[in-house]
Amino acid sequence: MLTYVRTSLFDSPAQTLVNTVNLVGVMGKGIALEFKQRYPAMFKAYKSLCDRNEFEIGKLHLWRSQAHWVLNFPTKTTWKKPSKISYIEDGLKVFAASYRDMGITSISFPPLGCGNGNLDWAEVRPIMEQYLSKLEIPVYVHDRQVTKGFIPEHKEVSFERIPVSFEDFLQDIREQMHAHSGTFATLKGRTLFGAKWHDDGGILIESPGRASQIHPEYIEWAWSALQSGIVSADQFPGDDSRKAKSYLFAILAELPYVRVTEIRKPEWSENTPAHGLYIKREDRNADMNSVDVPHDPGNQLCLSL
């Protein structure tokens, strides 16, 4: 279940984030430096592994904290040398064979070996698709190559909580509908429509020339999908639900903790990206102020074939 996403890796709803690293214990630039700053205990464990010469190409280092997991994926031998396609493939082979054993339930990758690694994304992408597209967990690749300007600008709004129950979620939707006086605009095309609650728990939609309904089960599907990652149109079974999706997405996008992103599936045309929604979890950013904790060997794994 591979999806390309245009968001920061650190905004991902995935359980595990992939950090591209070298074998000499240095995280001095790019995404690795940001990982080091956000997860100092992870960096300490990784550096210790490198100092003992126990890390190599084709090995993966999984570091687990209570909130987030980080998978250190070696794409370079040293920061002084570029990446190689063979390094990427060696690591992906290990990941595809061992992600279940590691307990990984969802994961976000950057374009492996690109950027500071100097690899061409046109060469890396098919390798990543080969190993990741058929895995049985949500896999997100934060691909900055996707067409820019597709997503309407979304205001950053602070929020005090994320709902823990479907009932709280419904109440938040009701409050947003009241705040907007029942008037919203679709994400694509910005077409205005009206929305009001139906007695059965669904939402009645009034748009130019037609009326329709978002059934209660569609809202439940969206809630369930948001708990596990990014919700997209292809998760809505049937034509009726997909038509209702464009209205439901517009309403949900107004919730202060929901973010809109551009997504694309490997099987889609390059020119047909779509919208996805995910919950912005503020605790990703809280790690910027985290404090080192004593090293616990039980919090990490180092695997190879």
Where are these regions (language model features)?
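Macrodomain-like recognition of ADP-ribose-binding/processing modules
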Residues: 1-249, 253-305
